[in-house]
A protein has these predicted regions:
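Basic/polar N-terminal segments that are highly enriched at the extreme N-terminus
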Residues: 1-20
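A short glycine-rich, His/Asp/Glu-containing loop-to-beta-strand
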Residues: 24-79, 84
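Short beta-strand segments in beta-sandwich/barrel cores
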Residues: 62, 86-90, 105-106
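Catalytic micro-motifs at enzyme active sites that drive phosphoryl/nucleotidyl and oxygen chemistry
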Residues: 69-70, 94-96, 119-121
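Histidine-centered active-site/metal-ligand motif
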Residues: 72-74, 90, 116-117
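Short acidic-glycine-tyrosine-enriched beta hairpin
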Residues: 92-109
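Hydrophobic, well-structured mid-protein blocks that either form specific transmembrane helices
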Residues: 108-122
């Protein structure tokens, strides 16, 4: 079996998956938001938990009814929202709007920049 070298200027990398128990994740709590962070996020920074390859954020957010994230910017990233329960309204600066329901998934490409909001509709 032969192994191909990576293209010039790229490096071959291997990553080891490390199981991180839920009770060892970072936790943030506000009046309207209960959030568990698998990697360093916001004020929770640990150089040993910066992400996995290009993946930088996995947050498990519970948002109070009628509350959420007002319009805020992102760029140069893909954002995946997986709805476990409830309904979440999404609106963005590209004119897109939708309500996501339990069991649905949304992918948003921030590319050169986008502004969006996410509000719990339940």
């Amino acid at each position: 079996m032969s192994r191909m070298a990576p293209p010039t200027g790229q490096h071959a990398t291997t990553s080891t998956v490390i199981l991180r128990p839920a009770d060892q994740r970072f936790h943030s709590q506000l009046d309207w938001l209960d959030s568990w962070h698998s990697f360093s996020f916001g004020s929770h920074q640990d150089p040993n938990w910066m992400g996995f390859g290009p993946l930088r954020v996995i947050n498990d957010d519970t948002i109070a009814a009628g509350q959420g994230f007002g319009m805020h910017p992102h760029r140069d990233m893909e954002i995946i929202t997986v709805m476990v329960e409830g309904a979440l309204s999404h609106a963005d600066s590209m004119g897109n709007s939708a309500v996501l329901h339990a069991g649905e998934v949304q992918r948003m490409s921030a590319g050169s920049g986008i502004v969006h909001s996410e509000i719990n509709q339940t």
